[in-house]
Amino acid sequence: MLWFQGAIPAAIATAKRSGAVFVVFVAGDDEQSTQMAASWEDDKVTEASSNSFVAIKIDTKSEACLQFSQIYPVVCVPSSFFIGDSGIPLEVIAGSVSADELVTRIHKVRQMHLLKSETSVANGSQSESSVSTPSASFEPNNTCENSQSRNAELCEIPPTSDTKSDTATGGESAGHATSSQEPSGCSDQRPAEDLNIRVERLTKKLEERREEKRKEEEQREIKKEIERRKTGKEMLDYKRKQEEELTKRMLEERNREKAEDRAARERIKQQIALDRAERAARFAKTKEEVEAAKAAALLAKQAEMEVKRESYARERSTVARIQFRLPDGSSFTNQFPSDAPLEEARQFAAQTVGNTYGNFSLATMFPRREFTKEDYKKKLLDLELAPSASVVVLPAGRPTASIVHSSSGDIWTLLGTVLYPFLAIWRLISNFLFSNPPPTQTSVRVTSSEPPNPASSSKSEKREPVRKRVLEKRGDDFKKEGKIYRLRTQDDGEDENNTWNGNSTQQM
């Protein structure tokens, strides 16, 4: 089969020029389409359709098939359409047929086409317009209603052509007119039936289009509903986020208010403490005592701040400031990292003092502790030598107790501690060897120990009047509780006059 290689409009124009039948073969991918294509490729079919036929083959998935189905509904695949000059299908083959059957159909279509061409010779211009109608129908913007109106006009062409041919002859015999009108009547009856079939098909096609539009409208409504729900969900999420942010801001505001309240309470407490101090100062009689009380409060506060500052510095400091005290009373200071071992400090001391004290060790006095070899491997922070500490350099073979203190009392105490064992041994030996002289010695000791007594008694006698005067002076302004004196207040008199019973309740 010689298939036309161009587009459908070009094939229609070629069929119009040659006055041939326009054949459209719609094929798919199924087995019947393959069989029908084989029938079209048969030699008999090719020979039968060689003249007066312009055939084109289109695929069901192509755009050309979609345009063609808008004018000529494709009910099944494969399908073969034989379209005449008027645009009306002369024959439609649905499904697959054998090659012999296809040859028979082709001869039948050729006879119908020849019969149609004989009846339309008188009105060639109208036949050309009928052929041009399918060509225009394949444009994308044409509708099924326009094709239906064109088909109805084409169906009315044969009677008009017959009438004009009769008027043109003007004197021919009635028998000839009758013989020319008989094929015209048959051709009019056949297009009317084809028109009804096409109207039904177009009606079905319109219903299908309406159904498709309805489904598309439903799909659009579903999409709109999905978008609406999505928008609603986004709005809810946005509102929830706003509420969460509002709650977070309210919580932060509440925490800030609590912090401000705590700060205000602390300020009030401090003010109360200051008021109490001022009230206590007002009860003092002299300006010196008031200033002394304020100075004591200030010193206590400074001491407390100093303790806090030192504890904070001890926790935060990364540098240890070590003071090395030498046996001769001199000292030197150096800073070390708080995580450095004690051995580093000892090496620094050894480099500084040189061989003056030979092999020495390190110790602290408060608390009293002499560092061992294991301690030299520990960090200064672990040994509580950070952020600052005072370390004593002890020469080798010298105990910790033999360190020279700046105080003379500490020296005599240290000497007494060292010499006490020797004195005890000497007393035992002397008592054992010299048994007679002990009474004289004791008397001498008594007499030697008696002279200091008058001095001590005189000192105590001198101190008594001073102590009495101090007590008399304190009697009005201070209240004694054991060995502790405190300032008097207005409530002290009531407390002294009140009595207390056994269950700690006060009786007025």
From Swiss-Prot:
Q: Where do the record's region annotations for Disordered lie?
A: 117-196, 440-508
Mode of membrane association: Peripheral membrane protein
Q: Which GO terms describe its biological process?
A: ERAD pathway; response to unfolded protein
Q: Does the keyword Endoplasmic reticulum apply?
A: yes
Q: Which Pfam family, just one, is annotated for this protein?
A: UBX7_N
Localization, UniProt: Endoplasmic reticulum membrane; Nucleus envelope
Question: Any transmembrane segments, and where?
Answer: none
Disulphide bonds in the chain: none
- Function, please? Involved in endoplasmic reticulum-associated protein degradation (ERAD). Acts as a platform to recruit both UBQLN1 and VCP to the ER during ERAD.
Question: What is the protein name stated in its UniProt record?
Answer: UBX domain-containing protein 4
